[in-house]
């Protein structure tokens, strides 16, 4: 009986002990549910440093190769680890093949750069075409039309009376041929789509070759005389019509040998650079039908041509007059420029051949419409006005106007015979018998208009006027009047009127687009995703800052101690170390954390206490 009485007591004690252990376990479980014990600041800093070191070991700084790496990974569909392993194995195979070090690269042969020809048109081929056509056809070719259809170059159409035609593309030095252009060599040699095998409407024999007559030779000579190289280069034209670039010693040696030369025009600058296409215009000035600019000064001659409406004139083109004693070099082989292209004006006597020469130092003039049939006289006052215009304008753009037919009587009455010639820029007087009517014309390249800064005001000294904000405590300074006015109206007068409607936010902005950009934060949409790790963001600039963790960029730097960081917030927080003690006057109602600004408290509440409803 006694043993049986002891057994229930032992069982009760065992049950009580088991109940105590269970209660202890439940208490321990309850303590774990409340969270782990808070670490000290030193322990937290030590753990943060250890985790950062582990992350730095795994981090690979790609730098500028980050973009190509992402593209390669996207095309291959591999992970970063698989792609890296493949590249390492590929590099090992290349290293074993060439028995070199991993960082040695296979030497590449440098690409030889094509040398562009200095002259636009090769006169040697032009002479060959002209001589061949002369043996096959009795008629002399002349310039039929200019077709600036393509804009990059002008197509000159040369045609004889038998109908043999040749199309020549004349490129402007303002738009030089690129070295990578496969057709640059052909253009440099004067070859175009319809070269010596171009079809003609008259015959089917070899005479269908495109004729290059005296006008072609004169035009190509003028094109070669114009330097396509940088300003200051020059060249010469021999009796064979070949343009040769030269220096001063070369010229002296050729002059001693007695080689007849035709030097480049003396004008340098836009006038010399834009002399490319030859447009013969049969202009007659004077009382007689065969008078050619007798006793006419250089400026007056330019004014005459500028006021003359020429058929086929391209709108927006520049007109340059070239004349002088260099015509003998072009006519040494008996070549004369045929200017008998019909003008369609009966009785004007424009069917006669006019000899051509070159005149140096003539500036461009602005072309204007002639004043009907009202005769005008060129007195001393008008000549003085022309000189003033020439001094003020280095290069005049032609006004866009409608094409009109030239009228010979108007031109005859424009410049009287009594006008006294004036000296040229080099001090030599022009000989009227050596003058010509060669006019060079190219389509003028449209100038890019730079958009001027709006509302900028210049003071008397030519400096930008600065606009200082007049309100007390504001140190903003602007150089544009519109920006200054926007600042005053929005910041000091109107204020932040755009309020965020999200509950608990209430942030205000000056502009509506700033509010729309802010509303993305409350929408929860993350449309900006990192290509490397897949992390998404609500704002694009947040993604750009995050990418710096992969590339290792630290573009922001402290001006005092040199501390570098990735984002502006880190730099602002760091700068507090160099300033006075910051006053934390705002406290969170839930956790008691203190902040410097009220906006920081609102942002902290939204992020750390999302369930808290503002009172």
Curated annotation (Swiss-Prot):
Biased composition (Polar residues): 226-236
Protein name: Zinc finger protein 653
Record field: compositional bias (Acidic residues): 419-432
Keyword Transcription regulation: yes
Positions of short motif Nuclear localization signal: 107-118, 445-451
Compositionally biased spans, kind Low complexity: 193-205
Residues spanning the membrane: none
Keywords per UniProt: DNA-binding, Metal-binding, Nucleus, Repeat, Repressor, Transcription, Transcription regulation, Zinc, Zinc-finger
Domain of life (superkingdom): Eukaryota
Entry keyword Signal: no
Function of the protein: Transcriptional repressor. May repress NR5A1, PPARG, NR1H3, NR4A2, ESR1 and NR3C1 transcriptional activity.
UniProt subunit comment: Interacts with NR5A1.
Region (Disordered) location: 1-48, 95-117, 176-236, 401-432
InterPro entries named among the record's database cross-references: Zinc_finger_trans_reg (IPR051061), Znf_C2H2_sf (IPR036236), Znf_C2H2_type (IPR013087)
Pfam families (alphabetical): zf-C2H2
Subcellular location: Nucleus
Organism of this sequence: Homo sapiens
Chief place of localization: nucleus
Tissues/organs with expression: Highly expressed in testis, cerebellum, temporal lobe, hippocampus and the adrenal gland. Moderately expressed in spleen, uterus, thymus, pancreas, kidney, stomach and rectum.
């Amino acid at each position: 009986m006694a043993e049986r009485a002891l057994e229930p007591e032992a069982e009760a004690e065992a049950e009580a002990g088991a109940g105590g252990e269970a209660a202890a376990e439940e208490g321990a479980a309850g303590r774990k549910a409340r969270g782990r014990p808070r670490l000290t600041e030193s322990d937290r800093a030590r753990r943060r440093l250890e985790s950062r070191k582990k992350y730095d070991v795994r981090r690979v700084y790609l730098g500028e190769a980050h973009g190509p790496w992402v593209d390669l990974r996207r095309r291959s569909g591999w992970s970063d680890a698989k792609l890296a392993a493949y590249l390492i194995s590929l590099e090992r195979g290349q290293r074993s093949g060439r028995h070199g070090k991993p960082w040695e690269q296979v030497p590449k042969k440098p690409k030889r750069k094509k040398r562009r020809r200095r002259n636009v048109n090769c006169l040697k081929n032009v002479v060959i075409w002209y001589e061949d056509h002369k043996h096959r056809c009795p008629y002399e070719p002349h310039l039929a039309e200019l077709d600036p259809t393509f804009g990059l170059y002008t197509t000159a159409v040369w045609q004889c009376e038998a109908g043999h035609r040749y199309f020549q593309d004349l490129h402007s030095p303002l738009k030089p041929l690129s070295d990578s252009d496969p057709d640059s060599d052909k253009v440099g040699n004067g070859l175009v789509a319809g070269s010596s095998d171009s079809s003609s409407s008259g015959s089917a024999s070899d005479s269908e070759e495109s004729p290059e007559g005296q006008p072609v030779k004169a035009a190509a000579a003028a094109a070669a005389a114009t330097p396509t190289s940088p300003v200051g280069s020059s060249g010469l034209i021999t009796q064979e019509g070949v343009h040769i670039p030269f220096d001063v010693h070369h010229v002296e040696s050729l002059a001693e040998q007695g080689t007849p030369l035709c030097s480049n025009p003396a004008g340098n600058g836009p006038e010399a650079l834009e002399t490319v296409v030859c447009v013969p215009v049969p202009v007659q000035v004077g009382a007689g039908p065969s008078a050619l600019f007798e006793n006419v000064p250089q400026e007056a001659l330019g004014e005459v041509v500028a006021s003359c409406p020429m058929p086929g004139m391209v709108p927006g083109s520049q007109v340059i007059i070239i004349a002088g004693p260099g015509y003998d070099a072009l006519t040494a082989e008996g070549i004369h420029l045929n200017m008998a292209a019909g003008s369609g004006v009966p009785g004007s006597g424009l069917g006669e051949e006019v000899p051509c020469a070159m005149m140096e130092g003539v500036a461009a003039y602005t072309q204007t419409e002639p004043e009907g049939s009202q005769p005008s006289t060129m007195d001393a006052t008008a000549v003085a006005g022309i000189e003033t215009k020439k001094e003020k304008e280095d290069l005049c753009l032609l006004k866009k106007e409608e094409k009109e037919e030239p009228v010979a009587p108007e031109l005859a009455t424009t410049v009287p015979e009594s006008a006294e010639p004036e000296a040229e820029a080099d001090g030599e007087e022009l000989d009227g018998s050596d003058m010509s009517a060669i006019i060079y014309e190219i389509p003028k390249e449209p100038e890019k208009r730079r958009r001027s800064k709006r509302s900028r005001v210049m003071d008397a000294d030519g400096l930008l006027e600065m606009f200082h904000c007049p309100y007390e405590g504001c140190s903003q300074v602007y150089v544009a009047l519109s920006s200054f006015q926007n600042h005053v109206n929005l910041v000091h007068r109107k204020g932040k009127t755009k309020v965020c409607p999200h509950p608990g936010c209430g942030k205000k902005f000056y502009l509506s687009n700033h509010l729309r950009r802010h509303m993305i934060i409350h929408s929860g949409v993350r449309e900006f995703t990192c290509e490397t790790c897949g992390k998404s963001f609500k704002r694009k600039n947040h993604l750009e800052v995050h990418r710096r963790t992969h590339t290792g960029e630290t573009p922001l730097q402290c001006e005092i101690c040199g501390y570098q960081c990735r984002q502006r917030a880190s730099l602002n927080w760091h700068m507090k170390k160099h300033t006075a003690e910051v006053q934390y006057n705002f406290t969170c109602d839930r956790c008691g954390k203190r902040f410097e600004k009220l906006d920081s408290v609102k942002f902290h509440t939204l992020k750390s206490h999302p369930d808290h409803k503002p009172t």
